[in-house]
């Protein structure tokens, strides 16, 4: 079956962000972005200023083709400092462009320090020092778009079988980002889990998906934790997740659903007001529940 915004539009909206509950997408037409050699610009600022600066730069500087943010993660200086990185096309574009490589001279060192952050607060401070001050000073940072997008997952692999990694992703309106930062400061440092990284990105308004993460433009915070692979570690993470979701939904935000079934059902319904119509459509198109998963059983059944 062919689906698009103009053909079988309802199913398209349900399948895009439908978590596999409305079928299997076997072929996809997507628009490609040309590969370019890019030059970075690094700007440090208080986290409270980040959202306004980030959105204003993206909205007004049309030369910016990629942008992201980071924040400090040590417990003593948690979310006390922010870094905005923007990329613009280099003036001279070589032909052909360089082959895809790792993302810079310090990538290997930063990967080692990334995993060393578990149980070692000094490594968190060292990583932030390299990423926010030393790296921008001693490396040119020029890279192709493809290289920036091709960071191997193996670089972040967890090798300690006593622990497991978990991602959280939250979406908040830029004008509420300061409140989100306060919520994270209140909750995350008290957790038993190790907080390893946060990457901030801009998400444009997208009202197409039935369960949209961005019915208005938002800032996404992708957060990486390392937790103990024990019942106590799992309970602690569940409590941390519920507390964060409570604060995020209180400011009109949402969270990405399928990382772990730690959210309460009422929290899912608050973050996604269209849940009832989503479930009704599921029962209409798939009454026998041919496509079913644990998330359906936990939140929608």
PLM region descriptions:
Residues 1-301:
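Noncatalytic alpha-helical scaffold of FAD-dependent oxidoreductases
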